[in-house]
């Protein structure tokens, strides 16, 4: 019976896998939309991710060469980051169990009974998805792999559409449902030209901008006609990104742009003179407009400039406070906590026991992947993940000039590192979809190189005409 089922399903394996991954990629941007997440008693993203996991596991189960595939895949550098997260997380769970006998706190017991199981469940789901994705990756065609990126762009496109709609609503009163987002400008004392920030369907700009920048990079890769990319995709995305007035988003674009420029400068295939000339021609009029209308530009950017006064004040800026003080709290209680952490999701314990200078409670995250993992998994776990993350970046960077897909892969990984500094979403669909698309780019680059080698070998083996040179 099982053998018959395998024979029946095997021809459809790639289609089923592609369907599951396309669903995950399309729905990933909505995981930061509260209305979407609260549609069911259990978070919607958890339900959809679990459904995707079940479908991928079913596809893998009917695979005929599971053991040999597993052995080969475990040697892949793609698993560095996964292993560096999975093993320390397991040790952190053991450490959290030990802490129950050491940290005599009802808040810690509450965390252990509630937040820990949820975090472990989410982590297991996403690590399992990416593991199965890598195991089954070679069964997907290039077209099916591209569908995953296009599906992710489709989800981001919905956020862009609602962002433009929100701009019309907040600027001219065009009717729109009240989404209860943090679109108001805050922490600014001076007058502003525009007193709102675009959030689209998300709760605040910092939730939105990582998806927009994802879309800019992936869209550039997938759009064959770059003029269509400019008018149909890039300009609408940049419009929403600009009016988000997100400091982290602006900094993210700048850093990724500088890194992409560095790749271009060190590239062996791009003519720098042809690139620099149009860039300078476009920057000169922009600079002149800024100089001529400086007061207007100053008011326009006041939602950003006006927040610099408290941006680096550790005691009054909640996000900075939650970034700095975990390095101190990590050494509380015992050396077990210092080395192995307080347990997955233990920032919830901090949220119940620590307070800001003005009396408010902490958030359940530092909004930084690396700081969260340092506190939750300790010096060993946090350090292992950081090292693996950097090693995989180096692995991609060394191959950047071999194929254009490798360039997109290293840019995406660099961008993921930047967004991880201000969005702690490593147990959410977006983080793992970007990991997936990065691996996808590397696989397409590998296939492209192999196709070129095969073409060269085929030409060298062609028989020459008698008397030919």
Tell where the protein language model's regions lie, with residue ranges.
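Loop-to-helix entry and N-terminal half of a specific, functionally important transmembrane alpha helix
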Residues: 16-29, 232-235, 364, 368, ...
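N-terminal hydrophobic segments of proteins, predominantly signal-anchor/transmembrane helices
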Residues: 18-36, 52-128, 416-417
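Transmembrane alpha-helices of multi-pass inner-membrane enzymes
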Residues: 19, 25, 29, 53-57, ...
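Hydrophobic transmembrane alpha-helices and their immediate junctions
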Residues: 79, 157, 226-229, 262-266, ...
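Alpha-helical transmembrane segments of multi-pass inner-membrane proteins
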Residues: 127-132, 136, 146-181, 190-194, ...
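A conserved mid-to-late transmembrane alpha helix and its immediate loop/hinge
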Residues: 204, 246, 357-396
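Flexible juxtamembrane loops connecting transmembrane helices in multi-pass membrane enzymes
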Residues: 274-275, 290-325
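Long extracytoplasmic/lumenal interhelical loops at the membrane interface
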Residues: 310-377
């Amino acid at each position: 019976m099982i053998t018959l089922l395998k024979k029946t399903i095997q021809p459809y394996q790639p289609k089923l896998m592609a369907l599951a991954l396309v669903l995950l990629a399309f729905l990933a941007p909505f995981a930061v939309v509260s209305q979407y997440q609260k549609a069911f008693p259990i978070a919607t993203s958890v339900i959809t991710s679990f459904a995707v996991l079940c479908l991928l596991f079913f596809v893998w189960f009917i695979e005929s060469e599971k053991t040999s595939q597993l052995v080969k895949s475990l040697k892949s550098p793609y698993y560095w980051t996964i292993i560096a997260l999975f093993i320390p997380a397991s040790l952190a769970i053991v450490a959290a169990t030990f802490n129950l006998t050491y940290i005599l706190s009802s808040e810690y017991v509450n965390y252990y009974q509630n937040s820990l199981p949820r975090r472990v469940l989410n982590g297991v789901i996403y690590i399992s998805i990416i593991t199965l994705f890598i195991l089954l990756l070679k069964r997907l065609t290039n077209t099916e792999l591209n569908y995953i990126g296009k599906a992710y762009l489709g989800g981001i496109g919905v956020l862009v559409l609602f962002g433009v709609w929100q701009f019309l609503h907040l600027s001219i009163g065009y009717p729109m449902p009240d989404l209860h987002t943090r679109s108001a400008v805050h922490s600014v004392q001076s007058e502003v030209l525009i007193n709102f920030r675009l959030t689209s369907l998300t709760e605040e700009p910092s939730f939105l901008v990582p998806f927009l920048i994802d879309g800019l990079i992936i869209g550039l890769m997938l759009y064959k006609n770059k003029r269509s990319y400019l008018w149909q995709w890039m300009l609408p995305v940049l419009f929403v990104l600009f009016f988000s007035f997100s400091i982290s988003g602006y900094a993210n674009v700048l850093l990724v742009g500088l890194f992409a420029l560095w790749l271009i400068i060190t590239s062996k295939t791009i003519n720098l003179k042809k690139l620099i000339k149009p860039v300078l021609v476009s920057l000169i009029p922009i600079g002149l407009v800024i100089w001529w209308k400086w007061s207007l530009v100053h008011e326009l950017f006041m939602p950003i400039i006006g927040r610099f006064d408290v941006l680096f004040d550790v005691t009054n800026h909640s996000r900075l406070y939650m970034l700095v003080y975990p390095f101190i709290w990590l050494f509380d209680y015992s050396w077990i906590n210092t080395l192995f952490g307080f347990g997955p999701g233990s920032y919830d314990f901090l949220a119940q026991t620590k307070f800001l200078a003005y009396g408010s409670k902490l958030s359940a995250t530092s909004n930084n992947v690396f700081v969260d993992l340092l506190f939750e998994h300790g010096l060993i776990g946090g350090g292992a993940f950081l090292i693996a993350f950097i090693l995989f970046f180096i692995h991609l960077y060394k191959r950047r000039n071999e194929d254009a897909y490798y360039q997109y892969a290293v840019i995406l990984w660099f961008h993921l590192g930047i967004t991880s500094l201000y969005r702690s979403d490593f147990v959410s669909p977006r983080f793992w979809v970007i990991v997936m698309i990065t691996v996808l780019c590397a696989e397409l680059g590998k296939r492209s190189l192999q196709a070129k080698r095969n073409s060269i070998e085929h030409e060298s083996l062609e028989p020459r005409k008698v008397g030919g040179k």
